[in-house]
Amino acid sequence: MVWFRCMRYGEAAIVLSAVLMGTVSVFVRNVGGDTLSVTFLRLFFGFLAVLPFCLRDVGRPDRTLLGLAVFNFLTVASYIAAIQSTEVAMAALLLYMAPVYVIPLSVLMGERVEVKTLLALPLGLIGLYLMLTPYAELTFGIIFGIVSGLSYAIVFVLSKEARKKHSPWRITFYNLGLGSAALLPYFLMFGRVGSWLWAIGLGVVPTAVPFVLFSYGMKYVKVQRAPILALIEPLCAGLVGYFYFGETLTLTQLIGGAMILAGVLIAWRE
């Protein structure tokens, strides 16, 4: 009973994390600056936001934490590069191909593929396709998007492993701290920013808070189920585009959004 309750909290944490991450385009478009500058600002201000909560729980990083920090950095940087190089919808679609890559990785980890996963995954991905309407040209933006999806899948797997030994605060501390430290020299020499206020918001709302929630949830949720729950992010991103940027939503997109929501509910249901 206790584990069931923890699993529910874990799933809710991942869904809430995805909702907050769905606002990232608002901040990225208002911050200004090149890809690496925006990536640094996101990681750095996120790191500062969690730092006061991590001072007593730093510890020494092991290989899992270091690997997680590397792939998390690669995911963030390649996704921002994709957003700046191609259609936002296409970048989001390629990032959220991660569930496809996660399933074989979860099998290698010894997880049994659940029936609900086999039902929820195609439903969610078809809905994602309908909602985001991809384009066929192979550009640098698409390549960055493919890289972001592959690295994001590895982030799910390594997060699950890291939570066996580390707290969400420690994981987030190294995820954000090591990434921002690696980019600090670049930012000091070449960095530029359009709005510091938006940069701070970028570090807190779609970064620090959802990163902690995501790390918490991964302890209690199966690797194969977590990225399906996270498909709620592009759905929220579409709603942000509609309400904040004034973008239109077609009937096809609305059907796609409903399919994503149905897939998430199937994955969530016990």
From Swiss-Prot:
Transmembrane segments: 12-32, 35-55, 64-84, 88-108, 117-137, 138-158, 171-191, 194-214, 226-246, 248-268
Domain EamA: 19-133, 150-269
Entry superkingdom: Archaea
UniProt GO cellular component terms: plasma membrane
Pfam families (UniProt xref): EamA
Assigned protein family: Belongs to the EamA transporter family.
Name this polypeptide is given: Uncharacterized transporter AF_1552
